[in-house]
Amino acid sequence: MAPVLHFYVRPSGHEGAASGRVFRRLQEKLPTLQSVETELCYNVHWAAETLPWAEEMKKLMWLFGCPLVRDDVAQEPWLVPGSNDLLLEVGPRLNFSTPASTNIVSVCQAAGLRAVDRVETTRRYRLSFTDHPTAEMEAISLAALHDRMTEQHYPDPIQSFSPQSIPAPLKGSIDILAEGRPALEKANQELGLALDSWDLDFYTKRFQELQRNPSTVEVFDLAQSNSEHSRHWFFKGQLHVDGKKLAHSLFESIMSTQASSNPNNVLKFCDNSSAIQGKKVKFLRPEDSTRPSCFQQQQGLRHVVFTAETHNFPTGVAPFSGATTGTGGRIRDVQCTGRGAHVVAGTAGYCFGNLHIPDYNLPWEDPSFQYPGNFARPLEVAIEASNGASDYGNKFGEPVLAGFARSLGLQLPDGQRREWIKPIMFSGGIGSMEAKHVGKKPPEPGMEVVKVGGPVYRIGVGGGAASSVQVQGDNTSDLDFGAVQRGDPEMEQKMNRVIRACVEAPGGNPICSLHDQGAGGNGNVLKELSDPEGAIIYTSRFQLGDPTLNALEIWGAEYQESNALLLRPSDRDFLSRASARERCPACFVGTITGDKRIVLVDDRECLVGKTGQGDAPLTPPTPVDLDLDWVLGKMPQKEFFLQRKPPVLQPLALPPELSVRQALNRVLRLPAVASKRYLTNKVDRSVGGLVAQQQCVGPLQTPLADVAVVALSHQECIGAATALGEQPVKSLLDPKAAARLAVSEALTNLVFALVTDLRDVKCSGNWMWAAKLPGEGAALADACEAMVAVMAALGVAVDGGKDSLSMAARVGTETVQAPGSLVISAYAVCPDITATVTPDLKHPGGKGHLLYVPLSPGQHRLGGTALAQCFSQLGEHPPDLDLPENLVRAFHITQGLLKECRLCSGHDVSDGGLVTCLLEMAFAGNCGIEVDVPAPGIHALPVLFAEEPGLVLEVQEADVAGVRQRYESAGLRCLELGHTGEAGPQAMARISVNKAVVVEEPVGELRALWEETSFQLDLLQAEPRCVIEEKQGLKERTGPSYYLPPTFPVASVPCKPGGPVPRVAILREEGSNGDREMADAFHLAGFEVWDVTMQDLCSGAIRLDTFRGVAFVGGFSYADVLGSAKGWAAAVTFNPQAREELGRFRRRPDTFSLGVCNGCQLLALLGWVGSDPSEEQAEPGQDSQPTQPGLLLRHNLSGRFESRWATVRVEPGPALMLRGMEGSVLPVWSAHGEGYMAFSSPELQAKIEAKGLVPLHWADDDGNPTEQYPLNPNGSPGGIAGICSQDGRHLALMPHPERAVRLWQWAWRPSPFDVLPTSPWLQLFINARNWTQEDSC
């Protein structure tokens, strides 16, 4: 048996702060705990017959250790327990290979360590107590130190990764012919198939008619393919409500909305995503995506793609993993639209129960509520689910630009408890596709069936059926665990590149059809792909991550990061070359047959004769052999008989002396209302360079934007907008009103981006409801009817969506239902992505005037509002969109004012009511307000806290009369409420109702209240001292001051530059994700830009002799599993071809390089920057030993990924790319998890600074270098943000200037920067081009 080698690593630097967080968490439960120490253990499966030789051991030690610390890796543990110590080791369950292992193995392969085939990382803790620890203390410690769903305790070091050596035998066929339905009932129970009584009868009868018994695999397959999750029986079924048969199914009703909207859908209800008619745009693409080649500018018609789905059950069981795979699955839905689409950006939403944050009292949360052991607690969901979705997007390279977060746990007047025990994890995605790739081609006999993506693992077996269980918790916990998946964004990124290579293929896209793998695994996706022609599939042709998988697991596992496609045999070579270049597996698993059947052949068990002497081969088994029409064809409608169950209503009873200020003390802290900074700061909001509007606005980057806007190309101001609407708490009172409000909220958010026309707006409708429990199915039907009616009145339509109809969980003997929820994602084409208005007030000092346009004028209903929830009630009558025509008129007028640039800011009235809307605009603008709301005869509380839909606008004084007249002439009310006040820390909010002052308080104090819940959550997910520093800073800050010195050069590129155009290689590695925006920046500056991969360099496919520049791009090479850019550095250092090529390039005096983010981390590891300037820099020698760097980029001091619109100051120095920019103070995107500049010694740092080799510093609001968080997002000493070589040719930066070369990419532009003709950051790239033209080069 091959050995498992152990490498123990002690933490160094501030990463040891993790021990402090563990200590704080444990000491609450274990007061005698004295200290916590940690170490990591890399458990390496060494598959060679002999142990590593000396050179291989050196490589392993370098990979696992810290380059700045000698002897921090050992093969014996550093931590040894004493008599009062507990030594605990925890790590991943071994039934699957983790994504971290996959990436570490890839790094080892790149370093030439071919014998490494699995590496799992465990964490070891030494807990020291005052006395000898008890077994109970050990149990408490273990529970706190690991996630029992995905991890386990290791009492002893791992000795083997192989639980068994051969596939587990399959059970025999299900004997329906002899036993009838009971045989199927038994299989249903044992396999967790979630078949209901109708299913059991139907399949028993079908197999009796066929006169054969189904195999175990076939029964499993049918359960997944025909589960509620996959078939949507309820929405397509025949519904009877209170004895009355509905004329149409819900699905038919939803489709009918298309009749009242413009016919601009190019895809609807028929593909992995929907799509609407786009615009012609110019864009860059490589000349040949299978080899290194030059980017060329092209033009074509690009459509807008949108999809949305939820991943609720897996997220409830294992929040981080469930959310990663929910995000990954939705990304694949975008990828697989038509014959391949471009992923652009995502949206995210979370609904969870009462948080019960330790030592933070939210008085509406009932402390007596119990929670089940088989679901994660709401607090864990809020933090870990958002961590999972954020981490996946960050590593894949998809920005998240909009979302929602909502909490509810409430006892209704009838005694029922409603709470999101089973949470909602919502993921939406917007993308683009070429018009010529809209239609999938039908399968034809002889076509190749191909799986692209990760290998098969025993992951997510039965997820489609498991998520369809009527009440979660009725399945066994083992089966629930088996249905949870794990995400590998690195693999998905590689797979995305293969699909993009096909989409951009010079000879035309070879993909004929494409589908993503999700619920039901291979069984579902390969049937869908081959329908109706049929296919034969061979188990031996799949790449297995685990050789012990049996046929059922190969066929049914929902392992992630896998797509299936069809192509003609003549295109096989193209796909093989593209996948090899991107290092992504592509398995040709079968062919289209034309016999209308799906057949799985388990040919792994086909032996060549028993004696090996040429006996006739055994017939391989066929675990699946089904008629496709029988499985996928039109099935009989299921019938559902539903009864309405009117809610028990109770008038809202607020404390009699409740003041507006006291109400705000609660409402501003409710998660649905409060700041979402804890979500936005940890997710990349700029990657890809196509983001025109993300969540954060104003000088303090407050997360309040109503709409997300993206470009269809870097080179155009044409794009798309999307906005969300959801009001589930109101559904507990009136499902119809809740549906109307969801639609209206999506549109009052979308209205602040300029779109082509209201009737062009299309929507994804996602339904999360416990529809099969008493009263809930009828409530959903009512909500659907209301949504259809209001959309017809508005002229918008649904073109896609998903449903999740088992939104209930068992808590003891009680069934706890979640509120019925409809999430509307509206999207449309933007003819001008720069014509967007944000909520932040922009004209302080009385120059901004505030107008209010109520859409249900005269109404002030409080039912289901944030105010009611904050007093543990619902009330009776919810807000509503009484007059849809008001919204139509308001939408058109607001859009016209956007075109005319007459609106300065705008925000919709929603959760928290009018007072929250006004205060949020003040918070975002860091600006005071003075307003008076006229509402004669109405008490201040309903006036201010009712959530009736409406708009609040800021206009300048000269436009007040004209804007009011526009709305009022259309029959709408438009009230002038007041004006802005002073800006900065002294800003005051003075709010009156009917001339009586109800709020008079500093904006900063109210904002601190609104931010408090977010900061409490942040304290649990980031380094507390950083959180406290940011909290304090918000109270004192005025906002950044940008500066361009008079000597700053005017950015200009000759249209036809003389002489040869200089070449720059955009160099990327596995996991890089910042290459396209980097290519755009250099192209804009006049370079000939080439797409080059590390695989190209390592294979000798290209040489760098003709290139003047190399850009090392941002991202997560190898997911940064062994430290930032460590894997990339290993590939450069240990591959002779790459080492020689880059070494020769560096030695040439006529070359330059730019390393950004991951590229910056790489240049530091390679020693291109950060080395001792007084010593001649050595390069890796022929013995391929790594350079000893002087600088290492370590984890941010906050302990998490940081996404910020930060400020930097450009310093004098030799950096050629920053010439003429010295003295500038500029904003720039920053997005990284490991940006802390750790020098080998303070002396080295001082030398580097003295030589002027630090050309960029993080700057405070006064433009001075800073270490203050988050102005310095990573905590680097002295505020260092960039570093260059002595000769200035090599520049390494942690921020992303390539994401800010176009002004529409900027997150905030104060005057006078709002009228600049070009972005100052373009000059950085122009400087590089100008340098290449100098005679000295």
Curated annotation (Swiss-Prot):
Subcellular location: Cytoplasm
SMART domains: GATase_5 (SM01211)
Entry GO terms, CC: cytoplasm
Limits of the Glutamine amidotransferase type-1 domain: 1063-1301
GO molecular function annotation: ATP binding; metal ion binding; phosphoribosylformylglycinamidine synthase activity
Modification type Phosphoserine: residues: S215
Pathway: Purine metabolism; IMP biosynthesis via de novo pathway; 5-amino-1-(5-phospho-D-ribosyl)imidazole from N(2)-formyl-N(1)-(5-phospho-D-ribosyl)glycinamide: step 1/2
Similarity annotation: In the N-terminal section; belongs to the FGAMS family.
Stated role: Phosphoribosylformylglycinamidine synthase involved in the purines biosynthetic pathway. Catalyzes the ATP-dependent conversion of formylglycinamide ribonucleotide (FGAR) and glutamine to yield formylglycinamidine ribonucleotide (FGAM) and glutamate.
Protein name, per record: Phosphoribosylformylglycinamidine synthase
